[in-house]
């Protein structure tokens, strides 16, 4: 059914064969859907290495830079120097000089604002910063999620192949397919209209996989529109239990309801509340795919390059803290409940991810980070600059376009402790301080 020469590269940075567990897809023989994701996302640009005489005294300030090609060349030469600074530097120039020129060149070549570039440079360091930026110039592969409430992935693949599509399974999600070529618009087929599948970025599958919804549970999707993750949750619940689907933006409710209806999600109730004012409680699991700056999805929205600054990070961080705090308040705290919140963003900034989780866990005192169960992704950061994060932060997962060939994403699973009270309400001073 599927080609054995996999083109998909949703993987770890260490090359390895990833075999798909077919235990949940009984219709497929064990010898199919193999040889999935097995190589690192390829390098986006070859590095230019100056000759020995030139590299020993390379001063980027003396370069004539008038064209894009000249900018690219200087970026590559600076990368080369920084990769082994002691050996390749000009003895009259310090490392900050090279880094500052590199940042300015990247901003000019790829049209980034200074604040956005500085945030990314601070996270990645100079070499990986350039790799990330270059990867964001490439579109990610088109993925769809099969609606197993209506048919199996193999059946959907056969239908699309018959229509001239070239498809391949995503190894770490039993319901997802990558579409490489299609003779028909994937978002306008009869099968799409009948709710057989939904186009969904591969990275956006990860939070629901980490949440692990179960049948007959009571689950909340806290910031749900347009509904891709909500319909995924419903699918894993097998249309049982109760799924409360909330979005604070009334203008997005119609599209949310439309997707739920088209996908046949009958266990869902749509509500329209600001996230911090949701009145319902005692949920077994909650998904908070929080509003964010979008610093992981630049390939989808190039405006993020220039319309974000450090003040946006501070404002967004306050919103995220408040929403995560509220989500933990809404959990059922009994032994029988899963008591978990999956916190995710499509941003790579530390301020919106580890820093938010760290603040809430330390200030509340009634919750902890647990393993996401995701087998791909880099570990969350234990520390960043002078900030040491709470224990378990490495159990969270980070995803990058230049490493995993998906949009930039952060996923963290948090469990509420049984019998432990929160130290304070949000916004109040802690009594133990």
Annotated model-derived regions:
Residues 1-433:
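S-adenosylmethionine
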């Amino acid at each position: 059914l599927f080609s054995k020469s996999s083109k998909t590269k949703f993987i770890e940075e260490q090359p390895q064969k990833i075999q798909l567990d077919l235990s949940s897809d009984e219709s497929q023989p064990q010898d199919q859907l193999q040889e999935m994701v097995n190589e690192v996302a390829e390098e986006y640009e070859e590095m230019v290495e100056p000759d020995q005489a030139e590299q020993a005294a390379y001063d980027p300030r003396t370069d004539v830079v008038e064209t894009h090609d000249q900018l690219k060349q200087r970026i590559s030469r600076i990368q080369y120097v920084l990769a082994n600074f002691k050996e390749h530097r000009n003895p009259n120039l310090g490392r900050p000089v090279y880094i500052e020129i590199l940042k300015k060149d990247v901003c000019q070549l790829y049209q980034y604002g200074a604040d956005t570039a500085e945030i990314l440079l601070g996270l990645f360091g100079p070499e990986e910063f350039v790799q990330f930026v270059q990867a964001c110039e490439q579109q990610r592969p088109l993925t769809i999620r099969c609606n197993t409430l209506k048919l199996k992935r193999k059946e959907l693949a056969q239908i699309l192949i018959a229509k001239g599509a070239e498809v391949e399974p995503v190894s770490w999600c039993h319901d997802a397919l990558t579409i490489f070529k299609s003779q028909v618009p994937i978002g306008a087929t009869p099968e799409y209209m009948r709710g057989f599948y939904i186009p969904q970025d591969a990275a956006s599958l990860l939070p629901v996989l980490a949440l692990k919804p179960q049948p007959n549970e009571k689950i909340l999707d806290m910031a749900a529109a347009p509904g891709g993750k909500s319909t995924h949750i419903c699918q894993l619940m097998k249309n049982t239990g109760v799924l409360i689907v909330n979005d604070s933006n009334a203008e997005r409710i119609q599209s949310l309801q439309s997707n739920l209806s088209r996908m046949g999600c009958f266990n869902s109730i749509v509500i329209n509340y600001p996230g911090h004012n949701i009145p319902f409680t005692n949920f077994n699991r909650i998904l908070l795919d929080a509003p964010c700056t979008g610093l992981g999805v630049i390939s989808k929205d190039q405006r993020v390059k220039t319309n974000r600054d450090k003040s946006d990070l501070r404002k967004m961080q306050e919103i995220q803290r408040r929403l995560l705090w509220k989500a933990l308040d809404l959990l059922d705290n009994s032994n029988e409940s899963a008591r978990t919140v999956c916190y995710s963003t499509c941003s790579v900034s530390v301020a919106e991810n580890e820093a938010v989780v760290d603040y809430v866990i330390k200030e509340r005192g009634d919750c902890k980070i647990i393993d996401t169960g995701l087998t791909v992704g880099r570990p969350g950061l234990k520390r960043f600059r002078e900030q040491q994060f709470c224990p378990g932060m490495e159990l969270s997962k980070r995803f990058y376009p230049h490493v995993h060939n998906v949009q930039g994403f952060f996923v963290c699973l948090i469990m509420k402790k049984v019998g432990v009270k929160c130290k304070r309400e949000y916004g109040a001073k802690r009594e133990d301080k």
